[in-house]
C-alpha cells in the first residue's frame, strides 16, 4: 500500500498499519494516513489476496479515527492518531486499539474499543501508576499493543496486559547516536515494558479499563542491531512456542555528509513463555528483516522497516505462516512472510543482566 495520488489525506505517507481479522473473517488494515503538516488519521482498508494466497492490494474503506479529542490535537491546528495496533480482547469480547495520540504534550498511548472494526469508542489516554520511583505518566509513550487474553500480573492475578515503550528524556535514538563503544544503559528507562490493568470478573469493560497499575520490565537493548533502542512491534500472538512478538530495534549506520548519525530501523523476533509472558524464551541475535529494498531505504525517514501488524494464515491452512505488515521508510506499507520453525533456534539472546551493551 502506498499513498494514493491526489488523496490529500495521504500526501506525506501511508504507514505502520494494524492488522486484524474481522468478524467476517476478512483481513483489515488500519494504516496511519499522514496529510500535510504531519496530520495523521487512522484509516481502514480490506486486504485483497491473489490466487496464491499472498496479499496483493487493498480496498480503502474510509477513516477509523481522526484527531478530535483534546489529547489528539495541537494548538496550531495539527494533531495525530498514529501507529495503531488492534487486538481482539477475548475477556471483553471486543476489539481494542492502542494508538499514539499526538498532542502538544507529545505522543501518549490512547485506547479505543469496537465490536465490528468500523465503529470505535474512544476510551481516553492510558494511565500508568509509578514503579520503584519511576513515573510513567507525563512521559512520551508509544509502540503499544495488548495481549488477547488475560495474563498473570507480577502478583499472579490474571489481568489485561499492554506492551509499551516509554520514551524517557535522553533515551531517543537521536540522543544516543554518536556515543562511541560501550555505554551505560538505564535498564528501567530504555526498555520495553508490560503493564497490567484489572478487568471485571464478568468480562465487561470496567471503569478502570486503561488504568495500568503494575508493571514488569520485559526487554532492554542487547544486540548491536538494537543498540540505540528497542520498541514494540506486532501485538503478541500465541504459538506452540509461546507468545510471538516481532519488534523493532535501532542501530547507527556509517556517517555521511548528509547525516552525521544516520539511523537504521530493523525487525527482530521475541518469543515469550506461554505461562509466564514476562520470561523471554527466544530473542533474535540478528534482525529477521532489515531495510534492503529501495522503498525501505528512501522515503520520509530513510532506512526503516517498522513492524506493526501480524496475521496467522489459518485461512489457507498454514498456521505456521505469519504475514507481517510493516512501514517502509515512513512512507509505504510492505508485507513479509515469517515461517515458524518446528524448534526455536539455539543461542537466542537473553535479556541484559548488566547495565552495559
Question: What do these predicted regions represent?
Answer:
Residues 1-16, 20-79, 88-141, 149-228, ...:
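Beta-rich carbohydrate-recognition and catalytic domains
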Residues 307-311:
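Extended, compositionally biased non-globular segments
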Amino acid at each position: 500500500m502506498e499513498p494514493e495520488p491526489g488523496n490529500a489525506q495521504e500526501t506525506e505517507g501511508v504507514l505502520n498499519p494494524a492488522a486484524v481479522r474481522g468478524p467476517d473473517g476478512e483481513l483489515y488494515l488500519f494504516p496511519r494516513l499522514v496529510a500535510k503538516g504531519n496530520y495523521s488519521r487512522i484509516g481502514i482498508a480490506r486486504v485483497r489476496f491473489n490466487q496464491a494466497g499472498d496479499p496483493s492490494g487493498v480496498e480503502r474503506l474510509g477513516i477509523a479515527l481522526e484527531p478530535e479529542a483534546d489529547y489528539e490535537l495541537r494548538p496550531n491546528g495539527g494533531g495525530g492518531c498514529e501507529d495503531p495496533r488492534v487486538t481482539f480482547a477475548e475477556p471483553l469480547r471486543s476489539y481494542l486499539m492502542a494508538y499514539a495520540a499526538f498532542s502538544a504534550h507529545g505522543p501518549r498511548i490512547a485506547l479505543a474499543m469496537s465490536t465490528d472494526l468500523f465503529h470505535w469508542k474512544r476510551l481516553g489516554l492510558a494511565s500508568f501508576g509509578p514503579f520503584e520511583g519511576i513515573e510513567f505518566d507525563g512521559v512520551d509513550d508509544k509502540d503499544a499493543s495488548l495481549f488477547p487474553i488475560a495474563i498473570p500480573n507480577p502478583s499472579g492475578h490474571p489481568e489485561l496486559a499492554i506492551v509499551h515503550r516509554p520514551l524517557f528524556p535522553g533515551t531517543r535514538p537521536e540522543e544516543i547516536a554518536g556515543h562511541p563503544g560501550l555505554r551505560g544503559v538505564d535498564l528501567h528507562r530504555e526498555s520495553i515494558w508490560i503493564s497490567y490493568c484489572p478487568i471485571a470478573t464478568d468480562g465487561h469493560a470496567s471503569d478502570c479499563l486503561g488504568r495500568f497499575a503494575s508493571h514488569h520490565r520485559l526487554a532492554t537493548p542487547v544486540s548491536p542491531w538494537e543498540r540505540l533502542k528497542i520498541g514494540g512491534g506486532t501485538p503478541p500472538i500465541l504459538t506452540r512456542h509461546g507468545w510471538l512478538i516481532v519488534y523493532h530495534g535501532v542501530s547507527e549506520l556509517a556517517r555521511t555528509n548528509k547525516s552525521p548519525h544516520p539511523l537504521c530501523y530493523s525487525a527482530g523476533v521475541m518469543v515469550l513463555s506461554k505461562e509466564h509472558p514476562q520470561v523471554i524464551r527466544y530473542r533474535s541475535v540478528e534482525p529477521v528483516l532489515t531495510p534492503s529494498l529501495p522503498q525501505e531505504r528512501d522515503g520520509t525517514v530513510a532506512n526503516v522497516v517498522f513492524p506493526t501488524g501480524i496475521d496467522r494464515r489459518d485461512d489457507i491452512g498454514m498456521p505456521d505462516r505469519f504475514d507481517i505488515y510493516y512501514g517502509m521508510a515512513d512512507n509505504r506499507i510492505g508485507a513479509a512472510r515469517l515461517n515458524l520453525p518446528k524448534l526455536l533456534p539455539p543461542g537466542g539472546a537473553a535479556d541484559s543482566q548488566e547495565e552495559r551493551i
